[in-house]
Protein backbone atom coordinates (compact mmCIF):
# COMPACT_ATOMS: atom_id res chain seq x y z
CA UNK A 1 0.00 0.00 0.00
CA UNK A 2 2.92 2.32 0.71
CA UNK A 3 4.00 1.90 -2.93
CA UNK A 4 0.82 3.44 -4.34
CA UNK A 5 1.18 6.99 -5.72
CA UNK A 6 -0.28 9.55 -3.33
CA UNK A 7 -1.72 11.99 -5.86
CA UNK A 8 -4.25 9.79 -7.57
CA UNK A 9 -7.82 8.65 -7.17
CA UNK A 10 -9.30 7.36 -3.94
CA UNK A 11 -7.93 6.70 -0.48
CA UNK A 12 -5.50 3.86 0.25
CA UNK A 13 -3.05 4.60 3.01
CA UNK A 14 -1.48 3.22 6.16
CA UNK A 15 -2.68 5.13 9.23
CA UNK A 16 -0.54 3.35 11.79
CA UNK A 17 2.08 0.62 11.78
CA UNK A 18 3.95 -0.90 14.71
CA UNK A 19 5.24 -4.32 15.69
CA UNK A 20 1.83 -5.37 17.03
CA UNK A 21 -0.23 -4.56 13.93
CA UNK A 22 -1.40 -1.98 11.42
CA UNK A 23 -4.42 0.21 10.63
CA UNK A 24 -5.24 1.20 7.08
CA UNK A 25 -7.79 3.52 5.48
CA UNK A 26 -9.51 2.63 2.21
CA UNK A 27 -12.42 3.78 0.11
CA UNK A 28 -13.84 2.03 -2.95
CA UNK A 29 -11.52 3.85 -5.36
CA UNK A 30 -8.55 3.12 -3.14
CA UNK A 31 -9.56 -0.54 -3.10
CA UNK A 32 -9.55 -0.57 -6.90
CA UNK A 33 -6.08 1.00 -6.95
CA UNK A 34 -4.83 -1.56 -4.44
CA UNK A 35 -6.19 -4.51 -6.42
CA UNK A 36 -4.89 -3.05 -9.69
CA UNK A 37 -1.41 -3.00 -8.14
CA UNK A 38 -1.85 -6.44 -6.58
CA UNK A 39 -2.93 -8.10 -9.83
CA UNK A 40 -1.05 -5.96 -12.35
CA UNK A 41 -0.12 -7.90 -15.48
CA UNK A 42 0.74 -7.41 -19.14
CA UNK A 43 0.26 -9.43 -22.32
CA UNK A 44 3.61 -10.71 -23.56
CA UNK A 45 4.74 -13.09 -26.27
CA UNK A 46 5.65 -16.65 -25.32
CA UNK A 47 6.97 -19.60 -27.31
CA UNK A 48 5.04 -22.86 -27.05
CA UNK A 49 6.12 -26.19 -28.49
CA UNK A 50 2.58 -27.27 -29.47
CA UNK A 51 -0.23 -25.30 -31.15
CA UNK A 52 -3.34 -24.60 -29.12
CA UNK A 53 -6.53 -26.34 -30.16
CA UNK A 54 -8.86 -23.34 -30.25
CA UNK A 55 -6.49 -20.44 -30.86
CA UNK A 56 -4.24 -19.72 -33.85
CA UNK A 57 -0.71 -18.51 -32.99
CA UNK A 58 0.47 -14.98 -33.70
CA UNK A 59 3.20 -16.55 -35.83
CA UNK A 60 5.50 -19.54 -36.06
CA UNK A 61 9.26 -19.60 -35.60
CA UNK A 62 11.89 -22.23 -36.32
CA UNK A 63 14.99 -22.50 -34.17
CA UNK A 64 18.10 -24.61 -34.73
CA UNK A 65 18.91 -26.90 -31.81
CA UNK A 66 21.81 -29.28 -31.24
CA UNK A 67 20.97 -32.62 -29.61
CA UNK A 68 23.17 -34.67 -27.28
CA UNK A 69 24.86 -36.38 -30.25
CA UNK A 70 25.81 -33.04 -31.81
CA UNK A 71 23.25 -33.27 -34.59
CA UNK A 72 21.58 -29.98 -35.55
CA UNK A 73 17.81 -30.05 -35.89
CA UNK A 74 15.19 -27.40 -36.57
CA UNK A 75 12.35 -27.12 -34.06
CA UNK A 76 9.14 -25.21 -34.68
CA UNK A 77 7.65 -22.96 -32.00
CA UNK A 78 4.24 -21.29 -31.89
CA UNK A 79 4.06 -17.72 -30.56
CA UNK A 80 1.10 -16.68 -28.41
CA UNK A 81 0.24 -13.70 -26.24
CA UNK A 82 0.03 -14.67 -22.57
CA UNK A 83 -0.63 -12.66 -19.40
CA UNK A 84 2.45 -12.17 -17.19
CA UNK A 85 2.03 -11.00 -13.57
CA UNK A 86 4.04 -7.87 -12.92
CA UNK A 87 4.62 -8.37 -9.18
CA UNK A 88 5.74 -4.77 -8.75
CA UNK A 89 6.38 -5.17 -5.01
CA UNK A 90 8.74 -8.08 -5.67
CA UNK A 91 10.47 -6.23 -8.49
CA UNK A 92 11.29 -3.40 -6.09
CA UNK A 93 12.92 -5.86 -3.70
CA UNK A 94 14.65 -8.14 -6.19
CA UNK A 95 18.43 -7.98 -6.67
CA UNK A 96 18.90 -5.68 -9.66
CA UNK A 97 15.20 -4.71 -9.56
CA UNK A 98 14.36 -5.44 -13.19
CA UNK A 99 11.93 -7.59 -15.15
CA UNK A 100 14.72 -9.92 -16.26
CA UNK A 101 15.55 -10.93 -12.67
CA UNK A 102 15.47 -14.69 -12.13
CA UNK A 103 14.06 -14.34 -8.59
CA UNK A 104 10.97 -12.59 -9.93
CA UNK A 105 10.70 -15.08 -12.80
CA UNK A 106 10.82 -17.91 -10.26
CA UNK A 107 7.94 -16.35 -8.33
CA UNK A 108 5.92 -15.87 -11.53
CA UNK A 109 6.54 -19.46 -12.60
CA UNK A 110 5.44 -20.70 -9.19
CA UNK A 111 2.30 -18.59 -9.27
CA UNK A 112 1.26 -19.77 -12.74
CA UNK A 113 2.04 -23.45 -12.10
CA UNK A 114 0.61 -23.81 -8.59
CA UNK A 115 -1.45 -21.11 -6.84
CA UNK A 116 -2.92 -19.97 -10.17
CA UNK A 117 -2.30 -23.21 -12.01
CA UNK A 118 -5.96 -23.54 -13.05
CA UNK A 119 -6.72 -21.01 -15.83
CA UNK A 120 -9.94 -19.83 -14.16
CA UNK A 121 -7.96 -18.60 -11.14
CA UNK A 122 -5.92 -16.22 -13.33
CA UNK A 123 -8.86 -13.97 -14.19
CA UNK A 124 -7.80 -11.03 -11.96
CA UNK A 125 -4.44 -10.87 -13.77
CA UNK A 126 -5.93 -11.43 -17.23
CA UNK A 127 -8.44 -8.61 -16.68
CA UNK A 128 -5.67 -6.12 -15.83
CA UNK A 129 -3.52 -7.29 -18.73
CA UNK A 130 -6.46 -6.72 -21.11
CA UNK A 131 -7.45 -3.41 -19.54
CA UNK A 132 -10.82 -4.62 -18.24
CA UNK A 133 -12.44 -4.76 -14.81
CA UNK A 134 -13.59 -8.08 -13.40
CA UNK A 135 -15.24 -6.53 -10.32
CA UNK A 136 -13.01 -8.16 -7.69
CA UNK A 137 -12.35 -4.86 -5.88
CA UNK A 138 -16.07 -4.12 -5.65
CA UNK A 139 -16.72 -7.63 -4.32
CA UNK A 140 -14.08 -7.18 -1.64
CA UNK A 141 -15.46 -3.75 -0.70
CA UNK A 142 -18.98 -5.10 -0.39
CA UNK A 143 -17.87 -7.95 1.85
CA UNK A 144 -15.78 -5.72 4.10
CA UNK A 145 -18.47 -3.06 4.53
CA UNK A 146 -21.45 -5.38 4.93
CA UNK A 147 -23.32 -4.81 8.17
CA UNK A 148 -24.39 -8.44 8.26
CA UNK A 149 -22.14 -10.74 10.25
CA UNK A 150 -21.03 -13.58 8.07
CA UNK A 151 -18.18 -15.57 6.64
CA UNK A 152 -16.55 -15.95 3.25
CA UNK A 153 -15.91 -19.32 1.68
CA UNK A 154 -12.20 -19.79 0.94
CA UNK A 155 -10.72 -21.25 -2.21
CA UNK A 156 -7.37 -23.02 -2.56
CA UNK A 157 -6.04 -19.78 -4.07
CA UNK A 158 -6.90 -17.96 -0.85
CA UNK A 159 -5.74 -20.70 1.50
CA UNK A 160 -3.58 -23.67 0.53
CA UNK A 161 -5.52 -26.92 0.75
CA UNK A 162 -8.95 -25.26 0.99
CA UNK A 163 -11.85 -26.97 -0.77
CA UNK A 164 -15.61 -26.61 -1.00
CA UNK A 165 -16.03 -29.30 1.64
CA UNK A 166 -13.57 -31.69 3.21
CA UNK A 167 -14.13 -35.40 3.82
CA UNK A 168 -16.16 -34.58 6.93
CA UNK A 169 -18.44 -32.21 5.02
CA UNK A 170 -16.96 -29.07 6.59
CA UNK A 171 -16.40 -26.07 4.34
CA UNK A 172 -13.43 -23.70 4.58
CA UNK A 173 -14.69 -20.27 5.68
CA UNK A 174 -13.31 -17.19 7.41
CA UNK A 175 -14.28 -13.65 8.37
CA UNK A 176 -14.27 -11.09 5.51
CA UNK A 177 -11.33 -9.13 6.95
CA UNK A 178 -9.26 -12.33 7.23
CA UNK A 179 -10.22 -13.29 3.67
CA UNK A 180 -9.12 -9.83 2.52
CA UNK A 181 -5.68 -10.25 4.10
CA UNK A 182 -5.25 -13.61 2.37
CA UNK A 183 -4.92 -11.75 -0.94
CA UNK A 184 -1.46 -10.59 0.10
CA UNK A 185 0.36 -13.62 1.53
CA UNK A 186 1.86 -14.80 -1.81
CA UNK A 187 3.85 -11.56 -2.01
CA UNK A 188 5.80 -12.21 1.20
CA UNK A 189 6.19 -15.89 0.41
CA UNK A 190 9.73 -16.95 -0.43
CA UNK A 191 9.98 -19.44 -3.29
CA UNK A 192 12.63 -22.12 -3.68
CA UNK A 193 13.13 -25.17 -5.88
CA UNK A 194 13.59 -28.53 -4.12
CA UNK A 195 15.97 -30.98 -5.77
CA UNK A 196 15.03 -34.65 -5.89
CA UNK A 197 17.75 -37.31 -5.98
CA UNK A 198 17.69 -40.36 -8.20
CA UNK A 199 20.15 -43.16 -8.78
CA UNK A 200 21.05 -43.52 -12.45
CA UNK A 201 23.88 -45.73 -13.71
CA UNK A 202 24.97 -46.13 -10.06
CA UNK A 203 25.48 -42.37 -9.73
CA UNK A 204 23.35 -39.93 -7.71
CA UNK A 205 21.74 -37.29 -9.94
CA UNK A 206 19.60 -34.26 -9.13
CA UNK A 207 16.43 -32.96 -10.77
CA UNK A 208 14.08 -30.10 -9.95
CA UNK A 209 10.92 -31.15 -8.12
CA UNK A 210 8.32 -28.39 -8.04
CA UNK A 211 8.33 -25.41 -5.68
CA UNK A 212 8.88 -24.94 -1.96
CA UNK A 213 6.89 -22.08 -0.44
CA UNK A 214 8.05 -20.42 2.78
CA UNK A 215 5.39 -18.32 4.52
CA UNK A 216 6.76 -16.43 7.55
CA UNK A 217 4.76 -16.23 10.77
CA UNK A 218 5.66 -12.65 11.63
CA UNK A 219 6.23 -11.77 15.28
CA UNK A 220 7.19 -8.09 14.91
CA UNK A 221 5.26 -6.57 12.01
CA UNK A 222 6.92 -3.17 11.60
CA UNK A 223 10.43 -4.56 12.03
CA UNK A 224 9.69 -7.31 9.53
CA UNK A 225 8.37 -4.81 6.97
CA UNK A 226 11.53 -2.75 7.40
CA UNK A 227 14.06 -5.59 7.27
CA UNK A 228 12.62 -7.98 4.67
CA UNK A 229 13.15 -5.68 1.64
CA UNK A 230 16.82 -5.20 2.55
CA UNK A 231 17.30 -8.93 3.06
CA UNK A 232 15.71 -9.77 -0.31
CA UNK A 233 17.90 -7.30 -2.18
CA UNK A 234 20.97 -9.03 -0.75
CA UNK A 235 20.10 -12.41 -2.31
CA UNK A 236 22.70 -13.83 -4.65
CA UNK A 237 22.21 -13.39 -8.40
CA UNK A 238 24.44 -16.36 -9.28
CA UNK A 239 22.69 -18.60 -11.81
CA UNK A 240 22.39 -22.38 -12.01
CA UNK A 241 20.70 -23.37 -15.26
CA UNK A 242 17.67 -21.10 -15.47
CA UNK A 243 17.18 -20.61 -11.71
CA UNK A 244 18.99 -18.56 -9.07
CA UNK A 245 21.54 -20.89 -7.50
CA UNK A 246 20.52 -19.75 -4.02
CA UNK A 247 16.92 -20.82 -4.74
CA UNK A 248 17.87 -24.50 -5.08
CA UNK A 249 17.37 -26.53 -1.90
CA UNK A 250 17.86 -30.15 -0.88
CA UNK A 251 15.05 -30.15 1.69
CA UNK A 252 11.87 -28.12 1.91
CA UNK A 253 12.96 -27.10 5.43
CA UNK A 254 16.15 -25.65 3.95
CA UNK A 255 13.98 -22.94 2.36
CA UNK A 256 13.10 -21.68 5.84
CA UNK A 257 16.73 -21.91 6.94
CA UNK A 258 17.75 -19.83 3.92
CA UNK A 259 15.14 -17.19 4.70
CA UNK A 260 16.18 -17.22 8.33
CA UNK A 261 19.81 -16.83 7.34
CA UNK A 262 19.00 -13.77 5.20
CA UNK A 263 17.11 -12.10 8.03
CA UNK A 264 19.72 -13.16 10.60
CA UNK A 265 22.53 -11.66 8.54
CA UNK A 266 20.54 -8.48 8.10
CA UNK A 267 19.97 -8.11 11.85
CA UNK A 268 23.27 -9.49 13.14
CA UNK A 269 25.20 -6.22 12.94
CA UNK A 270 22.62 -4.11 14.73
CA UNK A 271 20.16 -6.17 16.76
CA UNK A 272 21.68 -9.63 17.26
CA UNK A 273 20.21 -13.10 17.72
CA UNK A 274 17.57 -12.00 20.22
CA UNK A 275 16.00 -9.65 17.69
CA UNK A 276 15.83 -12.40 15.04
CA UNK A 277 14.20 -14.89 17.40
CA UNK A 278 11.36 -12.43 18.00
CA UNK A 279 11.08 -11.19 14.41
CA UNK A 280 9.74 -14.47 12.98
CA UNK A 281 7.97 -17.07 15.14
CA UNK A 282 8.18 -19.82 12.55
CA UNK A 283 7.46 -20.70 8.94
CA UNK A 284 4.62 -22.46 7.16
CA UNK A 285 6.08 -24.69 4.47
CA UNK A 286 4.43 -26.19 1.40
CA UNK A 287 5.84 -28.31 -1.41
CA UNK A 288 3.74 -27.94 -4.58
CA UNK A 289 3.87 -28.75 -8.26
CA UNK A 290 1.57 -29.18 -11.21
CA UNK A 291 1.02 -32.66 -12.64
CA UNK A 292 -0.93 -32.49 -15.87
CA UNK A 293 -3.97 -30.36 -15.10
CA UNK A 294 -3.83 -30.92 -11.35
CA UNK A 295 -1.88 -29.00 -8.72
CA UNK A 296 -0.41 -31.38 -6.15
CA UNK A 297 0.53 -30.57 -2.57
CA UNK A 298 3.28 -33.02 -1.66
CA UNK A 299 3.74 -31.76 1.88
CA UNK A 300 2.63 -29.01 4.23
CA UNK A 301 4.14 -28.38 7.65
CA UNK A 302 5.26 -25.81 10.18
CA UNK A 303 8.94 -25.37 10.95
CA UNK A 304 10.40 -23.30 13.78
CA UNK A 305 14.20 -23.20 13.39
CA UNK A 306 16.15 -21.99 16.39
CA UNK A 307 18.79 -19.28 16.16
CA UNK A 308 21.51 -21.87 16.72
CA UNK A 309 20.10 -24.01 13.91
CA UNK A 310 20.18 -21.05 11.52
CA UNK A 311 23.75 -20.29 12.56
CA UNK A 312 24.80 -23.92 12.07
CA UNK A 313 23.17 -23.90 8.65
CA UNK A 314 25.19 -20.81 7.79
CA UNK A 315 28.36 -22.62 8.87
CA UNK A 316 27.48 -25.53 6.58
CA UNK A 317 27.79 -23.25 3.56
CA UNK A 318 31.50 -22.52 4.00
CA UNK A 319 33.22 -24.49 2.69
CA UNK A 320 30.42 -25.79 0.52
CA UNK A 321 29.52 -29.47 0.38
CA UNK A 322 29.78 -30.96 -3.09
CA UNK A 323 27.85 -34.23 -3.00
CA UNK A 324 24.04 -33.88 -3.12
CA UNK A 325 23.39 -37.03 -1.09
CA UNK A 326 25.91 -36.07 1.58
CA UNK A 327 24.56 -32.53 1.72
CA UNK A 328 20.96 -33.70 2.07
CA UNK A 329 21.84 -36.11 4.87
CA UNK A 330 23.69 -33.39 6.77
CA UNK A 331 20.66 -31.12 6.44
CA UNK A 332 18.26 -33.86 7.58
CA UNK A 333 20.41 -34.38 10.66
CA UNK A 334 20.51 -30.64 11.35
CA UNK A 335 16.73 -30.27 11.07
CA UNK A 336 16.13 -33.47 13.05
CA UNK A 337 18.54 -32.54 15.85
CA UNK A 338 20.69 -35.63 15.25
CA UNK A 339 24.51 -35.99 15.22
CA UNK A 340 25.98 -34.83 11.91
CA UNK A 341 27.06 -38.36 10.97
CA UNK A 342 23.73 -40.10 11.67
CA UNK A 343 22.31 -42.23 8.85
CA UNK A 344 25.45 -42.56 6.76
CA UNK A 345 25.82 -46.22 7.75
CA UNK A 346 22.46 -47.00 6.14
CA UNK A 347 23.41 -45.03 3.03
CA UNK A 348 26.72 -46.87 2.71
CA UNK A 349 25.01 -50.24 3.19
CA UNK A 350 22.13 -49.75 0.75
CA UNK A 351 23.59 -47.72 -2.11
CA UNK A 352 26.23 -48.78 -4.62
CA UNK A 353 29.83 -48.14 -3.64
CA UNK A 354 30.08 -45.71 -6.59
CA UNK A 355 27.50 -43.40 -4.96
CA UNK A 356 29.42 -43.13 -1.66
CA UNK A 357 33.14 -43.86 -1.32
CA UNK A 358 33.48 -44.03 -5.10
CA UNK A 359 32.25 -40.45 -5.52
CA UNK A 360 34.91 -37.74 -5.13
CA UNK A 361 32.32 -35.30 -3.83
CA UNK A 362 31.29 -37.72 -1.07
CA UNK A 363 34.91 -38.14 0.06
CA UNK A 364 35.47 -34.37 -0.07
CA UNK A 365 32.41 -33.74 2.07
CA UNK A 366 33.51 -36.34 4.61
CA UNK A 367 36.86 -34.53 4.96
CA UNK A 368 35.16 -31.15 5.29
CA UNK A 369 32.76 -32.50 7.92
CA UNK A 370 35.53 -33.91 10.09
CA UNK A 371 37.47 -30.65 9.81
CA UNK A 372 34.41 -28.65 10.80
CA UNK A 373 33.73 -31.01 13.69
CA UNK A 374 37.29 -30.47 14.93
CA UNK A 375 36.84 -26.69 14.80
CA UNK A 376 33.53 -26.85 16.66
CA UNK A 377 34.59 -29.15 19.50
CA UNK A 378 33.78 -27.58 22.84
CA UNK A 379 36.33 -26.28 25.32
CA UNK A 380 35.48 -29.18 27.59
CA UNK A 381 36.32 -31.69 24.86
CA UNK A 382 39.49 -29.81 24.01
CA UNK A 383 40.61 -30.03 27.64
CA UNK A 384 40.22 -33.83 27.71
CA UNK A 385 41.53 -34.47 24.22
CA UNK A 386 39.77 -35.09 20.91
CA UNK A 387 36.19 -36.35 20.83
CA UNK A 388 35.03 -39.68 19.43
CA UNK A 389 34.81 -38.39 15.85
CA UNK A 390 38.43 -37.24 15.84
CA UNK A 391 39.65 -40.44 17.54
CA UNK A 392 38.05 -42.61 14.86
CA UNK A 393 39.48 -40.36 12.14
CA UNK A 394 42.93 -40.67 13.71
CA UNK A 395 42.64 -44.48 13.71
CA UNK A 396 41.62 -44.53 10.03
CA UNK A 397 44.38 -42.16 8.94
CA UNK A 398 47.06 -43.97 10.92
CA UNK A 399 45.97 -47.35 9.56
CA UNK A 400 46.06 -46.20 5.93
CA UNK A 401 49.36 -44.35 6.41
CA UNK A 402 51.06 -47.31 8.10
CA UNK A 403 49.84 -49.72 5.42
CA UNK A 404 51.20 -47.44 2.70
CA UNK A 405 54.60 -47.42 4.36
CA UNK A 406 54.74 -51.14 5.19
CA UNK A 407 53.44 -52.47 1.85
CA UNK A 408 54.71 -49.87 -0.62
CA UNK A 409 57.39 -47.94 1.24
CA UNK A 410 55.50 -44.69 0.61
CA UNK A 411 55.35 -41.62 2.83
CA UNK A 412 54.00 -38.19 1.95
CA UNK A 413 57.25 -36.33 2.57
CA UNK A 414 59.02 -38.59 0.10
CA UNK A 415 56.54 -38.21 -2.78
CA UNK A 416 55.00 -34.74 -2.50
CA UNK A 417 57.57 -33.12 -4.85
CA UNK A 418 57.44 -35.85 -7.53
CA UNK A 419 54.21 -35.77 -9.63
CA UNK A 420 54.47 -39.44 -10.68
CA UNK A 421 55.25 -40.73 -7.19
CA UNK A 422 52.54 -38.48 -5.77
CA UNK A 423 49.97 -39.96 -8.19
CA UNK A 424 51.02 -43.50 -7.24
CA UNK A 425 50.79 -42.57 -3.56
CA UNK A 426 47.24 -41.22 -3.96
CA UNK A 427 46.18 -44.29 -5.96
CA UNK A 428 47.45 -46.76 -3.37
CA UNK A 429 46.06 -44.70 -0.50
CA UNK A 430 42.61 -44.77 -2.09
CA UNK A 431 42.87 -48.52 -2.71
CA UNK A 432 43.79 -49.31 0.91
CA UNK A 433 41.03 -47.04 2.26
CA UNK A 434 38.52 -48.55 -0.20
CA UNK A 435 39.29 -52.12 0.84
CA UNK A 436 38.84 -51.17 4.49
CA UNK A 437 35.62 -49.27 3.68
CA UNK A 438 34.12 -52.30 1.93
CA UNK A 439 35.19 -54.55 4.79
CA UNK A 440 33.51 -52.30 7.37
CA UNK A 441 30.41 -51.94 5.20
CA UNK A 442 29.92 -55.72 5.15
CA UNK A 443 30.26 -56.13 8.93
CA UNK A 444 27.98 -55.19 11.82
CA UNK A 445 27.87 -55.81 15.56
CA UNK A 446 30.52 -58.19 16.93
CA UNK A 447 31.99 -58.77 13.45
CA UNK A 448 32.66 -55.05 13.07
CA UNK A 449 34.14 -54.81 16.57
CA UNK A 450 36.50 -57.68 15.76
CA UNK A 451 37.56 -56.05 12.47
CA UNK A 452 38.08 -52.64 14.05
CA UNK A 453 40.17 -54.02 16.91
CA UNK A 454 42.00 -56.72 14.96
CA UNK A 455 42.66 -54.93 11.66
CA UNK A 456 42.35 -51.16 11.91
CA UNK A 457 44.06 -51.19 15.30
CA UNK A 458 46.68 -53.77 14.26
CA UNK A 459 49.19 -51.01 13.47
CA UNK A 460 50.78 -48.79 16.13
CA UNK A 461 48.58 -45.84 17.15
CA UNK A 462 49.76 -42.92 19.20
CA UNK A 463 46.75 -42.77 21.51
CA UNK A 464 46.96 -41.71 25.12
CA UNK A 465 45.72 -44.20 27.69
CA UNK A 466 42.52 -42.26 28.43
CA UNK A 467 41.82 -41.88 24.70
CA UNK A 468 42.27 -45.61 24.16
CA UNK A 469 39.88 -46.36 27.04
CA UNK A 470 37.30 -43.91 25.67
CA UNK A 471 37.52 -45.42 22.19
CA UNK A 472 37.29 -48.99 23.52
CA UNK A 473 34.22 -48.15 25.60
CA UNK A 474 32.52 -46.46 22.63
CA UNK A 475 33.33 -49.44 20.41
CA UNK A 476 31.24 -51.68 22.67
CA UNK A 477 28.61 -49.23 23.93
CA UNK A 478 28.11 -47.16 20.74
CA UNK A 479 29.00 -49.73 18.11
CA UNK A 480 26.80 -48.31 15.35
CA UNK A 481 28.10 -44.78 15.89
CA UNK A 482 31.71 -45.98 15.69
CA UNK A 483 30.91 -48.02 12.58
CA UNK A 484 29.29 -45.01 10.89
CA UNK A 485 32.21 -42.77 11.79
CA UNK A 486 34.67 -45.38 10.54
CA UNK A 487 32.97 -45.48 7.14
CA UNK A 488 33.12 -41.70 6.94
CA UNK A 489 36.69 -41.51 8.27
CA UNK A 490 37.93 -43.96 5.63
CA UNK A 491 36.12 -41.89 2.98
CA UNK A 492 37.79 -38.75 4.31
CA UNK A 493 41.21 -40.43 4.35
CA UNK A 494 41.16 -41.70 0.75
Show which residues each predicted segment covers.
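Basic, glycine-/proline-tolerant helical and adjacent loop/strand elements
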Residues: 53-54, 59-238
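Long, contiguous all-alpha helical interaction modules
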Residues: 1-95, 257-494
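Domain-exit/linker segments immediately C-terminal to small folded modules
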Residues: 155-334
Amino acid sequence: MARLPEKTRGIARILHLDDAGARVELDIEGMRRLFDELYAASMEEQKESQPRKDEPPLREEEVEQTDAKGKVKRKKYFIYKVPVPRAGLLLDHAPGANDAGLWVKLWRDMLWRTLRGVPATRLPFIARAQGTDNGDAEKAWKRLTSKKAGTVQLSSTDYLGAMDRNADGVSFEDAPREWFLLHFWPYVTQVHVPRALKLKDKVIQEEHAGFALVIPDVGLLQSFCEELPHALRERSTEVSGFRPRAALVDLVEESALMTGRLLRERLSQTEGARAYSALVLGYELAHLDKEGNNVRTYSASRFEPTVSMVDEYQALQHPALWDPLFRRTRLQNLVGGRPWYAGFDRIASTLPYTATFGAKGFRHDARVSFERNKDMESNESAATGPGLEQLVLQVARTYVGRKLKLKHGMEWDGVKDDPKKKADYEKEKERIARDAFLAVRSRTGPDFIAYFAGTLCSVPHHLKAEQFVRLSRALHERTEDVRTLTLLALSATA
